[in-house]
Amino acid sequence: MTWLNRDVISSLDFTRDDLMQLFYEAKEMENYAKSKLNILDGKIMATAFFEPSTRTRLSFETAMLRLGGRVLGFGSVEASSVAKGESLGDTIRMLDSYSDIIVIRHSLEGAAKYAADIATVPVINAGDGTQNHPTQAMLDAYTIWREYGRLDDLTIGILGDLRYARVVTSLVQLLSNFKVKLRLISPEILRPRRELVDFMRMRGMNYSLHSNLNEVLSELDVLYVVRIQRERFPDPVEYERVKGSFKVTPESLIGAKDTLIILHPLPRVDEVDHRLDSTRYARYFRQSALGVPLRMALLKLVLKGD
């Protein structure tokens, strides 16, 4: 399927071929991530961020500006007419009339699909509900591909909140297009939702569930860490106990492969020790930086085509 005028709502909407085309385009865009092109001159991107965002919003805006386009929109509900009671539908209709593409983040699951059903321009989901963040998953997979030159035949560990972190669902769905082994590590209370486990089983994915990083550390090529969210725990004492056991430190990586890379969608709190920032394992800052060329490629493909 062509990328031109395509909505980007869910990781499930994209094939392996789609993703590889995006990755090669993003690799080319790395050459221009600090310069300006005129590919999207005259195009306007509207950002509708009903939830706070730093990296996702700014990388989309930077990508559009680097491509020669312009940006309008808002970064919080308070900065929009939603604060006055305007409906999501009316907001989308207004942005649709002003722009060539809409990038939306919302707390409600299905908000991006709802926006796409209303809008006449393409809509990109920058995160909605607790289960969808397709462009973050694209960035994560792209970072792994840039590091290893492939996604097939890698063992990827995902550590932390596997139940509520929306990027986890999107990343697993996206990785189902490749021959990977998944090792999912979390406290019992934050195990993946049944729907995600059923999806992995249906797709015939090689996966296993674990409660301790040590069980799988030596086989990992990638360790993807997501924040454990305090607000999900009814008992603060239980949170403190669990949080401490899922912190990645130099000491906890004894026995890891020399080639292991650590990724994190950011922001981090204390789940990845800052002492790791200068080690050979750390790739999370490069991962964040690659968000600009990845989203440049995405915008170019959707607005200009192959």
UniProtKB/Swiss-Prot annotation:
InterPro entries: Asp/Orn_carbamoyltranf_P-bd, Asp/Orn_carbamoylTrfase, Asp/Orn_carbamoylTrfase_sf, Asp_carbamoyltransf, Asp_carbamoyltransf_Asp/Orn-bd. It comes from Caldivirga maquilingensis (strain ATCC 700844 / DSM 13496 / JCM 10307 / IC-167). Catalyzes the condensation of carbamoyl phosphate and aspartate to form carbamoyl aspartate and inorganic phosphate, the committed step in the de novo pyrimidine nucleotide biosynthesis pathway. Pathway: Pyrimidine metabolism; UMP biosynthesis via de novo pathway; (S)-dihydroorotate from bicarbonate: step 2/3. This is Aspartate carbamoyltransferase catalytic subunit. Heterooligomer of catalytic and regulatory chains. It catalyses: carbamoyl phosphate + L-aspartate = N-carbamoyl-L-aspartate + phosphate + H(+). Transmembrane segments: none annotated. GO terms for molecular function: amino acid binding; aspartate carbamoyltransferase activity. L-aspartate binds at K84, R166, R227.
